[in-house]
Amino acid sequence: MAEEEDYMSDSFINVQEDIRPGLPMLRQIREARRKEEKRQEANLKNRQKSIKEEEQERRDMGLKNALGCENKGFALLQKMGYKSGQALGKSGDGIVEPIPLNVKTGKSGIGHETLLKRKAEEKLESYRRKIHMKSQAEERAAEQFRIRLKNKQDEMKLEGDLRRSQRACQQLDTQKNIQVPREAWYWLRPEEETEEETEEEKEQDEDEYKSEDLSVLEKLQILTSYLREEHLYCIWCGTAYEDKEDLSSNCPGPTSADHD
């Protein structure tokens, strides 16, 4: 029978645990140390000023300090009567502070920045001109559209007034037993010819319509005058008056504008 192990013996009690870090722990430590070194290096760089910054600071410091008597040029000015802080010029109204020094640090040639600025201004001015011209063109197009629309509306109104005059003329002529209009266009032309109409009559009507050279406005003016003279009627008033005196007294005039 095998001997049982004694868990209270020294072989178990005095065993020391192996607490050495494994591979993952070593990686974490190295990564943390590397980050700390980078942080310290970045802080050091931030604390150190560049050569250009140091030159700029020394230059600004020198320009801020006034020249002392030890300066030969300033001593010569004092002998000529100049006092520290006095304005330049005979009348004493010149500048007091020295002209600021603008040090060029870029690699571009002299006048390059001025050229770029002028080109940018020219480009901006060209853009503004294009916008202005485009705006003017849009305004002209809108105005022309309004004019065309108004002309179209005016034309449609004239055509409507002419049809009303032709319809009224046909009714009033018929009431006076006038069988044939004074002019063919005084009456509304039927949209469809009757079957009894001969081919000769059709050709005659077509010739009459083709030979018309009067505009809608001219036809309306002529027909309006006929209705007023022959029937004492005004299409805009919609009234047949008793006599010429009644017509002239109560009708505003022979045009549509007179009735607005």
Swiss-Prot record:
Its main location: nucleus. Residues 33-60, 187-212 are annotated as: Disordered. Keywords: Acetylation, Centromere, Chromosome, Coiled coil, Kinetochore. Residues 69-115 form the G-patch domain. GO terms for cellular component: kinetochore. The modification N6-acetyllysine is found at residue 123. It is found in: Chromosome, Centromere, Kinetochore. Pfam families: DUF4187, G-patch. GO terms for molecular function: nucleic acid binding. Residues 192-210 have a biased composition (Acidic residues). Residues 25-61 form a coiled coil. Disulfide bonds: none annotated. Belongs to the GPATCH11 family. This is G patch domain-containing protein 11. It comes from Bos taurus. The lineage of its organism: Eukaryota, Metazoa, Chordata, Craniata, Vertebrata. The gene is GPATCH11.
